[in-house]
A protein has these predicted regions:
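Domain-level marker for long, solvent-exposed, non-transmembrane regions
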Residues: 1-189
Length: 189
């Protein structure tokens, strides 16, 4: 849950600060200002992906080290967490009974700290989608796909967790010229 919050809030902040939607698309027009071609600006899109991944890694590493001076706790949605524990890199405390996978004992025993440990593996990609939207219009969408691998460290065991998400970044409606006639096939009736 914490990972999900940190990833989504980090992506939101990078997009809010760094994103100019018009730079993500290249639109070529003819002399009459009609659209000839639309393409995605690969350089700008990859810069955005790189900034997102770097910011997520930095936030996780700072939380892992307990260095709260370099992160904005409110922006990441961590204002309700115990700051003493966050300074130790602890993101959650669970009862000892949960480790034994027994529902009767799940709420009993002392609490065990769960530390965040970035396994050094955040991978990302950009997906683009073009959809027909009415007559001679197109809806362009750009999404960031992230996969994050982490280790959850408990005193008895260590478990590797994988987290995948797809976050929409930009949508743009491109309007072409509406033709003077439109033929949508022959109806047999």
């Amino acid at each position: 849950k914490v990972t999900n919050i940190i990833v989504h809030r980090t992506v939101d902040k990078v997009i809010e600060k760094e994103l100019d939607i018009d730079n993500l698309y290249i639109i070529n027009r003819d002399n009459n200002k009609n659209i000839n071609m639309i393409d995605f600006n690969a350089v700008e899109v990859n810069k955005l992906l790189s900034k997102v991944i770097n910011n997520i890694q930095n936030n996780f590493q700072n939380i892992e080290k307990g260095d709260l001076s370099k992160i904005n706790i409110e922006e990441l949605g961590l204002e309700n967490y115990d700051k003493k524990n966050l300074k130790k890199g602890i993101i959650y405390r669970i009862p000892l009974g949960i480790i034994f996978n027994n529902t009767l004992l799940s709420n009993f025993g002392p609490t065990i700290p769960i530390k965040i440990n970035l396994n050094g593996n955040i991978s990302g990609s950009i997906s683009t989608k073009v959809t027909n939207y009415g007559i001679n219009n197109a809806l362009l969408e750009i999404s960031i796909n992230l996969e994050i691998n982490q280790l959850v460290m408990l005193p008895i065991t260590t478990e590797k967790l994988s987290f995948k998400t797809s976050i929409p970044v930009a949508m743009k409606l491109i309007q072409g010229i509406v033709p003077s006639y439109y033929f949508n096939g022959i109806d047999k009736n």
